[in-house]
């Protein structure tokens, strides 16, 4: 549903204050129209007469839905609508608690954590340790060994994918970082 009011304003989308309920309705609509056949919808934010999306999705019951966020509301949305959860900037000490909460919410929806594809977005800076806001080391930064250990921690928690990103805009440094990732770290995980 987003987290920056400036993005909502720039895109001239529905108001930022109601982004959660708007996103919930969009997810309901998306899942319904992907199923094929005519769909009508009557929600608080969206209403439409019978319409059909053609061709229907070949993925059943709908294409995968990866939902990001670490708040309780985001986790509820994952449990109700998602086929996967993407955590971003999640302190490793909070992973067990967030996974436990997500598991509880999944159970309320007749699901388990095993039903979800767990993904983490990790910003990398191999060879340069960077501080996090709490004064510790930011995950994904530091030596080859340290970053390798960070990735293994996510694997140990059941994550099946990690999306790597270099936070800078220097193309040469970005290429160097991903070469290091491919050559020095990926063979170890």
Q: Predicted segments — roles?
A:
Residues 1-189:
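Active-site-adjacent structural elements that line small-molecule/cofactor binding pockets in enzymes
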